[in-house]
Amino acid sequence: MFKAIWAARWYVLLGLFTFLLILIATTPLHFVWRFAEPAVGRLPVKIEQLGGTLWNGQLRLQVPTLRSAGVIEGQWQLSPLSLFSASPQVHLSLSGDGIRFDGDARLSADQTLTLTNTSAYLDADVLEPLLKRNRTGIKGNFELNAVSGWFNLADRGFGDVAGQLLYSGGDVSFLVDRKTVNATMPMVAGSIEMVGDKAQVNIATMEGTQLIQAYAQQDGWGGVSIRRRFLDVLGQQWPAKADEDTVIFEVSHKIL
């Protein structure tokens, strides 16, 4: 009898593997959510509704800081084999008013969220309520392509950040000496990369002329520096005599 069982060991293992897959697939989402909610709760989103199955699910969420995007609808597809590892992988698609996201995400046991093959779209109108507080306005849309990187939800560390940013161009308004200046911004492109342990975005015209540089550091501080050439692109003049590569504005702030 023992020999018969040993001879059929592969069939036993296959049956056990199949049983585990069926068990996981039929597990109610509300049961799984109890374990996932603490990690998801660290993200700046509010999950309102879940549906579907563990493999193929739907969700509705809101971003408190971007209420103008309304309720965002989402779908996910979970990789079955990744469930047997310490970091399940999911393909996530989100869509709201003027906002879209599509990419692969992996969450490991140490609460590290890794993004790959990520793209996103944002209509500038979604940012209007935030910008109005500083009497600033912008029209057009932003696109992120081929974005990847990791972010630890526990200690807020990050790394391996890379990708491309594109702004369509459009009308902008901002304050200069307490006066509102209106201008038209041309299309610009940005490269996202790691410089040491710092994430950096370099924004330039389509011809490659550098305009703006932004960064985020591991200690949670981020900043932006603007060259005088940026005002030239907007058709504005800088009152002081300065070379076009001179940084005329620089600010840093705690962002993480």
Regions found by a protein language model. Give the residues of each.
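Hydrophobic membrane-insertion alpha-helices, especially the h-region
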Residues: 3-27
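Alpha-helical transmembrane signal-anchor/signal-peptide segments
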Residues: 29-50
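N-terminal beta-strand/beta-hairpin edge segment
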Residues: 45-136, 147-149
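Residues that define the transmembrane beta-barrel architecture of outer-membrane proteins
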Residues: 53, 68, 138, 184-188, ...
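Short, surface-exposed beta-strand/loop "edge" segments at domain boundaries and coil↔beta transitions
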Residues: 66-71, 94-103, 121-129, 171-177, ...
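Short, hydrophobic/proline-enriched secondary-structure or compact coil segments at domain edges
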Residues: 88-92, 112-120, 163-165, 201-205, ...
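Short helix-loop boundary/capping segments
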Residues: 153-193
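Extracytoplasmic/luminal low-complexity segments enriched in Pro/Gly and acidic/polar residues
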Residues: 194-256
